[in-house]
Regions:
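Intrinsically disordered, low-complexity Ser/Thr/Pro/Gly-rich regulatory segments
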Residues: 1-165
């Protein structure tokens, strides 16, 4: 189980899209205990041969502090991810994405070596994909609770949003 809403949403989305997902993976075991880092979400789609490391964040830190934190996380990802999916031939490149809530891409299209994706853009992608899938014929599986909720909000948006006026 993910530690927060954003990690859970990202993990559900990639699982729903056919990826094998690892969450909150401690990597780089230290001799005296503990780990070098923790990778929030790592997803692999063997059919597409796509490997992605996602670090969602709700922080409002300075860009300098974010740069240091995400650089450390993404470097650990490049170092340790190749060992996480034993038995699979992984692609040589790992797509790395920082998903941010409180940010703008205008001055910061990348962070720590990864691409910046705003939560609004992720939500748009999800809503566009789910928007064409009626629950009666294409219900999101029940273990993807956030995605299923979004699917119902999309399906019943007129009734839902009319009550807010």
């Amino acid at each position: 189980m993910a530690n927060n809403f954003l990690e859970q949403l990202v993990a559900e989305w990639y699982e729903y899209k056919g990826y094998f997902v690892r969450r909150n993976v401690p990597v780089g075991r230290r001799a005296r205990g503990g780990h070098e880092s923790e990778l929030d979400v790592v997803a692999f789609n063997p059919t597409l041969r796509h490997l992605v490391h996602i670090e969602p964040s709700l922080d409002a830190e300075s860009w300098d502090k974010r740069e240091r934190l995400f650089r450390r996380k993404f470097e650990a990802g490049r170092k340790y991810i190749p060992d996480l999916f034993d038995g699979y031939e992984l692609p040589p490149d790992i797509e790395q994405i920082a998903i941010l809530v409180f940010a703008s891409r205008s001055n910061h299209p990348t962070l720590g070596g990864g691409k910046v994706l705003l939560i609004s853009d992720l939500m748009r992608q999800i809503m566009e994909d789910l928007g064409g899938k009626k629950p009666i014929a294409n219900l999101v599986p029940e273990h993807h609770t956030i995605l299923r909720t979004l699917q119902f909000v999309i399906e019943y948006r007129k009734k839902v949003f009319d009550t807010l006026r």
